[in-house]
Amino acid sequence: FGLDPVYCVRINPLGPGCPAPPKHGAPRMPGPAKYDEIEPTLFPDNAPLMDDLREHLRTHDRESFVLWAVVDGFFWFPRRLFGIEEHFYAFFDYPELMHRMNAGLAEHSMEMLRQVGEIATPDFVTFAEDMSYNHGPMLSEGMFAEFVEPYHRRVVPVIDQIGSIAICDSDGDVTEMIPWLERTGTRGGLPLERQAGVDGMAIRRAHPEFVMIGHYDKMVMNRGEEAIRAEFERLLPLMRSGRFVPSVDHQTPPGVSLEQYRVYLRLLRKYAELRVK
């Protein structure tokens, strides 16, 4: 399709021996007391990941691809262990354990990112968080300040030191939490879901320096060329404002045909050219 290749370095804090949840969203540990048992399976050295990156660089010119590094965020990681429902109770029932988990994650993320930075400079680094849904954040600003912010503040300077930028990957409407992120040094967000009510131009007016990736409403892609074009028209002022990479907000839906996707790509290239004129 002529798109820029992307190489993603996914730094997983769960080692191969970490127990799998019995179903999606279920706990990986039967109870908080079991954390001592599973902790030795966490925070692996990820040596194969680093070896794969070195091999890729041996066979590819660095300027020929986008390098994207991903670390677990400090809302997301405890949820992977506690399970979705139990995680929300844990903020109140097990705050000390939450901090212990996130302190360990922060140390692991910093070490892994330093290793990546010694091999190559990522174009950007995302915190996998998913802290929002279509009505905004799933935690209060106070909870963010207590359980998430201190650990972002530890990791972001390392991201800066290796020459990259920190971006928060969160589903839903992140608008309310952008000031929270900015004060940690996190400089952008993705995928800025249009279906969740995100308004990119409103974000740009309130946060002129905020980096944005995504925000193209994927739900119009099977509605014909005019609908696809109209969505690019909506985004053109944001594209011209800078610090914005338009892309499908999440994956292209399965109902989009190959021909419809080609129309999307043709118009993406056209509007990218219009952006600089």
Identify the meaning behind each predicted range.
Residues G2-L49, T59-W68:
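A contiguous, low-structure linker/loop signature
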Residues E39-K277:
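Active-site loop segments of alpha/beta catalytic cores
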